[in-house]
Amino acid sequence: KSLNNNQIKQICNTIHSLNPNCVCFVDNCYGELVEDSEPISNGANIIAGSLIKNLGGTIVPTGGYVAGDSELVEKACCRLTSPGIGSEAGVNFGYGRLILQGLFLAPQTVHESLKGADMVAAVFKKLGFMVLPEPKSYRSDIIQAVKLNSPYLIKKVCQSFQNSSPVDSFLNVIPSPISGYESKLLMSGGTFIEGSTSEFSADAPLRHPYNIFVQGGSHIAHIKIALIQLVFELL
């Protein structure tokens, strides 16, 4: 379960009280625009995230961001480009308009994702599965975890969601090794942007307790259709 901003504030305040020079760096992926403030307003010195997640509004094809203390942001830019150049130069591959439009759309798409996550939680709980967060509970990101307890069900759910995708719905999901994971991973990702998790998608490591992580969704109607189809297949 992710930390909410109140918890981040308590952690950062404690760290800074012990060492004011310590830098608190927060991975903000999946958490942008979910709460009414961001970690940099709650004691974090710098945050970073991906633009194929919340802030990209489902239309930005690649990229990421850093925000926070100007000195730290400039250091990150120097690491990205070169020392002495920093943020003064760089490329955006012509995606400037898409990035700005994605940021404009992001509050609405995050809202749809949150509604969808709550619906996913409610449906799976009704089917008898453990879910985290619980339906209608406070959320600090757009991810919904479901404990399926079965590799068969992992495959069944991922394949069903893939079949309900707007693109690549004809593909079969197969377990694959993914960098950063100890076990093979199953993914449902029929998305317009490759790898996008702000669009409706799911992934699940093939190991006990066989949890599946569902996230994203630009339209609540799509999530409803995917869940209806899944219920028919499970029952």
Regions inferred by a protein language model and the residue ranges of each:
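Conserved C-terminal alpha-helix-loop-beta "cap" of PLP-dependent enzymes
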Residues: 125-136, 140-235
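Conserved PLP-enzyme active-site core in the AAT-like
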Residues: 1-111, 115, 121-124, 128-132, ...
